[in-house]
A protein has these predicted regions:
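Short beta-strand/loop motif that positions the catalytic acidic residue
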Residues: 449-452
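Cap/lid segment of the alpha/beta-hydrolase catalytic domain
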Residues: 118, 127-198, 244-245, 405-430, ...
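A catalytic-pocket lid/entrance helix-loop region that shapes and gates access to the active site
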Residues: 218-220, 225-343
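Histidine-bearing beta->alpha loop at or near hydrolase active sites
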Residues: 482-496, 528-531
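Alpha/beta-hydrolase fold nucleophile elbow
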Residues: 199-210
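Catalytic-loop region of hydrolases
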Residues: 24-120, 133-142, 279, 292-293, ...
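Glycine-rich nucleophile elbow surrounding the catalytic serine of serine-hydrolase chemistry
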Residues: 208-218
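Conserved alpha/beta-hydrolase "acid-adjacent" motif
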Residues: 458-462
């Protein structure tokens, strides 16, 4: 048991260490490649500290403990004050034998306060299941300088728990993770800003991708009065349902997988060559929708009616044959894209789009690795009522429901909607926006930009499109006055894939909030560090990203240049 415990803990620590290292290494080394596409809004009124950095050790706010204050004048970024601390320290339920029966919980945070302050505040919503205080740089999806480098005061938090899903045993920790950490941290952060600079922030922004995108959508629904602009990337706003779909998907892949050590190894169900085969077939069917053959599907929704896996991908009997898929592979992939269902055919989540980005290594990561390592703990311990410890101790057998000993879709999927006397909020309650129509945000005049990679393998872009369609049906022409959606063709989960995943949508949001400039389109370009960009694309390729439902259409000229395309409502 000790070895198992160390292995499990190690797995989650590796995930969060990588997250921390990537945050430190992310520092905008490539944004200069296309810096002419960035705009620097200046509408908020800048400010400067009115007290010394170290005086923040004496900052006083209910339930808050300041544990460390330092000043960074290393020159790597703008000079800034770093404040670390925690809120609402308490004792709660643990997960023996991984943790003691009772453990200490607190909402850990870090704030970075630049000397050259822009007058703005940025809430950095983090990914995964949180659990670590990622440095508060304010890294922004799409590349470019961080919020800190642009003079924002930035906060980051662990959402009220440490690494690993064990916190799911504690009812309050679940709620802190879902939404309450934001509720607690926001007024404290603004008060700390007032203490340091002598005034509250003029404008406040909230941003994140993946679970961070979920945090952003939840905050836009619950706390619209606290923020002026929200920037949500690949948002898992139905995260419990998406995680259930991942487990269901693993069970589908297992039906066509080779056995390793007596169990199906789902990574053998599709090879990288199989992924490339499907990607090429999708391109063959859909590439020229926009009027030019360029290795991109610019209208992914229109593509769904044009591509048919049974017709467009050759079929073979031998699983080892090249240039074809077996009937079993086609059947499984078709089921995955149609969306998870229970035995009655009732949908558990939503469908996934056929997209050439299926070739991405990120697709394999989510389909074959995360589904058997991260999703079990998330579904079993965090989202389900009651929590199921076997999701951890049962290992792969629990994921695959081996011999009926694990996750049974019909029996266990409904647990994300359940409550009891101990867990009074269901997973689908504390993890999701309570008002998907964002009525408070719309009434206030706040702004929301959502972007989503069309090849996202975990949070279906179809779910986001369906949400925006419902929003548009509700508000009609007024929708675009406060909410915009941008689809990123070929992009995997938050970045990567055969895509132009560099873009400056965040400053478009700031311009919209502070100058009233509506973002109808922005320019996207190549990330030179993205190894999945096709070799026949120019490293200078650009494209317009169009506010949904508009799509880019070729009008003539150099197909590598965004100016050769225009956004058209189809």
């Amino acid at each position: 048991m000790k070895k198992i415990t160390m292995l499990i803990v190690g797995m989650f620590l590796v995930a969060f260490v990588v997250n921390d290292v990537s945050a430190r290494n992310w520092h905008h080394k490539n944004w200069h490649h296309k810096n002419r596409y960035y705009r620097y809004p200046t509408e908020a009124v800048p400010g400067a500290p009115v007290i010394g950095c170290m005086e923040l050790l004496d900052f006083n706010y209910p339930g808050t403990e300041i544990t460390e204050v330092t000043f960074d004048d290393s020159g790597d970024m703008l000079d800034h004050c770093i404040v670390r601390g925690s809120m609402n320290r308490r004792t709660g339920l643990g997960f023996p034998p991984i943790t003691p029966a009772e453990v200490t919980y607190a909402i850990g945070f870090e704030m970075r306060l630049p000397t050259a302050w822009s007058g703005r505040y940025f809430y950095q919503a983090n990914g995964g299941i949180d659990g670590s205080v990622v440095p508060a740089y304010g890294n922004i999806s799409g590349g470019g300088p961080s919020a800190l480098e642009m003079g924002f005061a930035v906060i980051s938090s662990d959402a009220g728990h440490g690494p690993g899903p064990w916190f799911g045993m504690d009812p309050q920790a679940r709620i802190d993770y879902g939404y309450n950490a934001v509720a607690e941290l926001t007024p404290m952060a603004k008060r700390l800003i007032k203490t340091y600079y002598g005034k509250f922030p003029d404008k406040s922004y909230f941003a994140g991708c993946s679970n961070g995108g979920r945090h952003t959508m939840v905050a836009a629904s619950r706390y619209a009065d606290e923020y002026d602009g929200f920037f949500a990337g690949d948002p898992g706003f139905n995260l419990p349902k998406a995680a259930v779909a991942q487990l269901w998907g693993a069970q589908q892949y297992a039906t066509i997988s080779a056995y390793v050590n007596g169990r199906p190894d789902i990574s053998t169900s599709f090879s990288t060559e199989d992924q490339a085969l499907v990607s090429d077939a999708i391109l063959a069917a859909c590439d020229e929708i926009d009027g030019v053959e360029d290795g991109m599907v610019s209208d992914p929704l229109a593509c769904q009616a044009l591509f048919n896996i049974n017709r467009d991908v050759p079929t073979c009997e031998d699983p080892g044959a090249e240039g074809c898929l077996t009937y079993g592979q086609k059947s499984v992939l078709a089921r995955i894209h149609a969306g998870a269902m229970n035995s009655n055919g009732d949908p558990l989540y939503t469908n996934f789009l056929w997209d050439p980005g299926i070739i991405s290594g990120n697709w394999r990561q989510w389909e074959f690795i995360a589904s058997t390592s991260l999703d079990p703990g998330a579904v079993g311990l965090i989202f389900s009522v009651p929590p199921d410890p076997n999701c951890i101790f049962g290992g792969l057998d629990w994921v695959l429901n081996w011999n009926g000993t694990g996750f049974d879709v019909d029996r266990d999927a409904p647990k994300i909607y359940a409550t009891d006397d101990t867990y009074t909020e269901a997973g689908m309650s504390f993890m999701t926006p309570p008002d998907l129509f964002m009525k408070q945000l719309q009434a206030k005049g706040g702004k929301l930009i959502v972007f989503h990679g069309t090849a996202d393998a975990v949070f279906a872009v179809a779910d986001t499109v369906n949400w925006y369609e419902a929003l548009s049906a509700h508000y009609k022409s007024q929708t675009k006055d406060f909410a915009r959606l941008f689809l990123i063709p070929g992009m995997a989960h938050c970045s990567g894939g055969p895509a132009l995943d560099q873009f400056d949508l965040f400053n478009a949001l700031v311009d919209w909030v502070e100058r009233g400039i509506k973002p109808d389109s922005v320019t996207a370009w190549v990330n030179p560090d993205n190894s999945e960009v096709p070799s026949d694309w120019s490293q200078d390729r650009t494209r317009p990203l169009c506010a949904y439902p508009a799509v880019p259409v070729y009008k003539g000229g150099d197909k590598e240049d965004a100016s050769s395309f225009e956004c058209i409502y189809q």
